[in-house]
C-alpha cells in the first residue's frame, strides 16, 4: 500500500508547493544569484529540502514497519545516512538536468523539448555505466565473489541466458536487511552480477542458480 501511495503523495506535495506560492518564494531567493547555474542550484536545493522534510514521516513509517516485521536490520543512524546520501545524489542530478533544460530553452525556445528528448538516451546510458562503480559503493561495500566455483557456475548460466557480464560481486546487505536478492547492473566494462550476502548465507548453490 505504501509503495503505491508514495508517488501520488509526492505529486500532491508538488501541487501544494505550486499553488501556495512557496515555489515563487524559492524562485525569488534563487534569482538573487549572479550566475544562473547557482540560481538553479539554490532553487532545486530548497525544493528538494522541503520535500525531504515533508516526506520524512512517511519514509520513517515505512522504515519502522519494515523493522517490526523483521525485514530490516538497519540501525536508524545507517538508515538516516542512506536517506541523506539519496538527497544529495538526487540534488546533484536534478541540478544538472534543470540547468541543461534551461540552457536548451534559452538557445532553442521552439525545439528545446526535442533536444532534451535526444539527450535522455545518452544520459541514461551514462548513469547506468557509472552506477555500479560510483553510486552503489557509496551505500554498501562490494567485493568480488569469494566462492570462485559458484562464480564459474553463475557466469556459465549468464552466458546461456545471453547476459553480458564477466564479473560477479557480493555486497554486505545483511547489515541492513534479512531479504534475499541478486541482480544484474551496469553496462559495458562495468556490467556485473551482484548477490546479496544474505542470499549467499541462506541458500545453497543450486537454489541460487535456480
PLM feature spans:
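Polar-ligand-bearing catalytic/cofactor-coordination segments
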Residues: 1-210
